[in-house]
């Protein structure tokens, strides 16, 4: 590096100017500066790479944690949905059991009412005086109690507005509100005795 400006005599002699210029520069010092600068750049790049690697690792860990939390939240949501479905199914099952029990009780009551009705008709037939219609029938005394009970049932149904159509195996029900006549099949396996009885009584 130059330490001082060349004097007038040196400018007049170019050879002396070159020699003096070489003497004023320190190559060793400049090499040290270059080496130091290169070392600083190397350390700076190394530190930058370390920070980048650390940042990338932390970002990867954060992404992994976020993925795990999202999966855990989805699993909890699915579990809650499954529990809700199980609870709903259990509630429906309990309702079905309750309705089945109620239906069974109603059918038992229907059977009991039928038995009481048959017994009452039989007693009425045994204790009542023969009607005018049966007095003129010579074969009435030959009829069995079952036939007599069935005849009494037919009379009762007829008095309530129910007519049996034996030709078509159906019952004709005259509605109590004078809205017309309803029909119900008597030999339809898809209809239970409970349904038939309820259907008839609802329309009387």
From Swiss-Prot:
Pfam families the UniProt entry points to: Spc24
UniProt subcellular location: Nucleus; Chromosome, Centromere, Kinetochore
Origin superkingdom: Eukaryota
GO biological process, alphabetically ordered: cell division; centromere clustering; chromosome segregation; sister chromatid biorientation
Primary location class: nucleus
GO cellular component: Ndc80 complex; nucleus
Keywords for this protein: Cell cycle, Cell division, Centromere, Chromosome, Coiled coil, Kinetochore, Mitosis, Nucleus
Molecular functions per Gene Ontology: identical protein binding
InterPro entries from the UniProt entry: Ndc80_Spc24, Spc24_Fungi_globular_sf
Coiled-coil ranges (or none): 29-127
Cited function: Acts as a component of the essential kinetochore-associated NDC80 complex, which is required for chromosome segregation and spindle checkpoint activity.
Quaternary structure and partners: Component of the NDC80 complex, which consists of NDC80, NUF2, SPC24 and SPC25.
Family, as annotated: Belongs to the SPC24 family.
Name by which UniProt lists this protein: Probable kinetochore protein SPC24
Source organism (scientific name): Eremothecium gossypii (strain ATCC 10895 / CBS 109.51 / FGSC 9923 / NRRL Y-1056) (Yeast)
């Amino acid at each position: 590096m130059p330490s001082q400006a060349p004097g007038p005599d040196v400018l007049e002699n170019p050879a002396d100017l070159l020699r003096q210029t070489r003497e004023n520069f320190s190559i060793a010092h400049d090499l040290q500066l270059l080496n130091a600068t290169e070392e600083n750049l190397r350390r700076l790049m190394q530190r930058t790479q370390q920070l980048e690697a650390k940042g990338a690792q932390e970002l990867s860990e954060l992404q992994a944690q976020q993925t795990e939390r999202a999966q855990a939240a989805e699993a909890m949501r699915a579990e809650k949905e499954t529990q809700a479905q199980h609870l709903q199914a259990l509630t429906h099952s309990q309702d079905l059991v309750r309705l089945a029990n109620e239906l069974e009780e109603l059918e038992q009551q229907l059977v009991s009412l039928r038995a009481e009705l048959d017994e009452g008709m039989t007693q009425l037939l045994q204790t009542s005086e023969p009607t005018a219609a049966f007095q003129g029938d010579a074969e009435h005394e030959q009829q069995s109690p079952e036939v007599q009970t069935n005849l009494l049932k037919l009379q009762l149904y007829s008095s309530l507005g129910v007519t049996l159509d034996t030709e078509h195996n159906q019952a004709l029900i005259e509605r109590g509100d004078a809205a017309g006549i309803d029909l119900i099949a008597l030999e339809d396996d898809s209809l239970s005795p409970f349904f038939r009885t309820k259907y008839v009584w609802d329309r009387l």
